A protein has these predicted regions:
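Peripheral, non-catalytic segments that deliver or gate enzyme domains
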Residues: 1-200
Length: 200
């Protein structure tokens, strides 16, 4: 029938569809419940939801397909969607996008705490581990107050070329330190698995 695909059953997911009409993102990582990012029609409010997957509802457990709100965000103008968010770290921390209007920067948070520096516009999250997030960024030099622990620019003498025209791949640890993965300005992406990293 229409309710099954190739023998797979379909489970309806419940959330406040009246106030949050759009499903903006879905992410499901090993060992964790699926995440949904839902938005209102004006795309000024969103909710990050976890989807309960328990096989059978036992007394006191949430019904299969029900959701729990993990985070909510609002912006009177517009909420940007950053591909690759929301996501769980392997150890269960929640990484989300933050449209930080005070810093004029699209940032990342871990469990609600911003950890990417102001002036580093996160455009896409490529990979999330317990130690870091691999991301594509555009740097806004006039907003960039980042100081590396060694006092040196992440790109040494070439920092001026890594501005809003350059889509760079960097690693952010959860203390906000930046490790560039691309040396030259350009339009870059990457794929990482374990210790391997392919830059394209």
């Amino acid at each position: 029938g229409h309710d099954e695909y190739a023998g797979l059953g379909i489970q309806q997911i419940s959330w406040n569809r009246k106030d949050y009409e759009y499903v903006a993102a879905v992410h499901w990582s090993a060992g964790h419940e699926p995440l949904l990012l839902v938005q209102n029609r004006r795309q000024t409010r969103d909710q990050v939801l976890s989807v309960h997957l328990g096989s059978e509802a036992s007394e006191g457990s949430a019904p299969v397909g029900s959701t729990t709100v993990l985070e909510e965000h609002a912006n009177d103008q517009w909420l940007d969607i950053i591909q690759g968010t929301p996501a769980f770290t392997p150890d269960g921390r929640l990484v989300c996008a933050l449209n930080d209007m005070d810093a004029d920067t699209n940032r990342l948070t871990v469990d609600g705490r911003p950890f990417t520096p102001a002036g580093w516009q996160v455009r896409e999250v490529l990979d999330v581990t317990d130690e870091d997030v691999l991301a594509v960024v555009q740097r806004t030099p006039e907003l960039d107050g980042y100081e590396a622990p060694d006092g040196l620019s992440p790109w040494r003498g070439d920092a001026d070329g890594h501005d809003a025209r350059s889509f760079d791949v960097v690693s952010f640890d959860y203390d906000g330190n930046v490790l560039p993965m691309t040396a030259r300005p350009g339009s870059w992406s990457a794929s990482r698995r374990g210790e391997g990293l392919v830059i394209s």
